[in-house]
């Protein structure tokens, strides 16, 4: 696996659970709530802001309008019972409405969301119903298959991540192709009086990506792109696929829940401008450091080291 490297072994635990570590890391964060970091090189912005706040969204986006938004909604609040489902959906409505105000008339919106099989698959169905009341039109329900899952011997293993795709207006869509070769042949069809086999009718030598993604590696500690401490990191390849499909070079991409900074990094690699925010100063700092780290080293993450290894040292408690 080409993106598996041997790096320094300085892991840190999940940052949402370690109160003392968080207090220590806040000393190294350059942003405080309400502040925005501006990238002088390519025009990216990172804000320590609240996605449900209209003034905060305006602070980040100003008069810019994006062609694409990719939000990894913090559905773990439901799993940890920090919010009731109805409160969470009401909050999501604010986030979606705020996104709509800073998206172009023709644009795309992607929402990562969970489905708790122990709780009626909440909050997925509730979010779907809420989205019917917005100005967005549903386009696809995508499943990203994890290589590892969880469950018991009395149920099917849970190995999926859910991604909802919506649009407003008539945005561009560029079909994407996987690295999977076409293996199944023999489906013939008469096209303009000529009998053709299915592989001859296709536009690529490999399989076109559908709404079930089985070809993307789940992030784990041996991958270069891994960012220790970030418990909800999405694969860089998944975000790159979305950006390639639903935007063009030079477009603006939004992400209101930056977390590990994957959307910002993908935008940098794909020649887009990213306007992103996180309410947590630590994840804002990680996002900025990940971009800087990539520009300095060409590496997409820290594998089993961490963004604060210099400050914390090998034992993680300087």
Question: Locations of the language-model features?
Answer:
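Core catalytic lobe of class I
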Residues: 1-17, 23-277, 281-284
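Conserved SAM-binding loop
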Residues: 287-288
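Short, flexible loop/turn segments with low-complexity composition
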Residues: 177-181, 298-309
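C-terminal catalytic and target-recognition region of SAM-dependent MTase-like enzymes
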Residues: 315-318
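Conserved SAM/SAH-binding loop
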Residues: 51-54, 305-313
């Amino acid at each position: 696996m080409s993106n598996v490297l041997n790096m320094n072994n300085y892991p840190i635990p999940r940052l949402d659970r370690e109160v003392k570590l968080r207090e220590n890391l806040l000393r190294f964060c350059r942003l405080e709530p309400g502040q925005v970091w501006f990238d002088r090189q390519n025009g990216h912005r990172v804000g320590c802001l609240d996605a449900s706040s209209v003034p905060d969204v305006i602070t980040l986006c100003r008069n810019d309008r994006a062609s694409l938004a990719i939000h990894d909604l913090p559905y773990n609040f439901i799993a940890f019972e920090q919010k009731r489902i109805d409160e969470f959906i009401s909050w999501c409505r604010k986030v979606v409405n705020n996104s709509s105000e800073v998206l172009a008339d023709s644009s795309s919106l992607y929402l990562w969301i969970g489905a708790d099989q122990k709780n009626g698959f909440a909050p997925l169905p509730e979010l779907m119903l809420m989205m019917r009341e917005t100005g967005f039109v549903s386009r696809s329900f995508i499943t990203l298959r994890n290589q590892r899952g969880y469950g018991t011997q009395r149920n099917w293993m849970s190995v999926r991540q859910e991604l909802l795709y919506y649009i407003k207006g008539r945005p561009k869509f560029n079909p994407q192709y996987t690295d999977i070769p076409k293996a199944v042949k023999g489906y013939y069809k008469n096209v303009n009086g000529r009998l053709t086999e299915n592989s001859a009718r296709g536009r690529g030598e490999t399989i076109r990506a559908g709404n079930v993604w089985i070809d993307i590696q789940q992030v784990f500690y041996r991958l270069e792109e891994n960012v220790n401490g970030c418990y909800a990191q999405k694969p860089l390849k998944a975000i790159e696929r979305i950006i390639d499909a639903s935007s063009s070079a030079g477009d603006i991409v939004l992400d209101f829940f930056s977390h590990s900074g994957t959307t910002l990094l993908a935008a940098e690699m794909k020649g887009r401008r990213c306007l992103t925010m996180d309410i947590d100063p630590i994840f804002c700092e990680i996002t900025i450091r990940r971009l800087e780290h990539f520009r300095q080293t060409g590496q997409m993450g820290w594998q089993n080291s961490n963004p604060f290894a210099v400050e914390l040292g090998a034992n993680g408690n300087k």
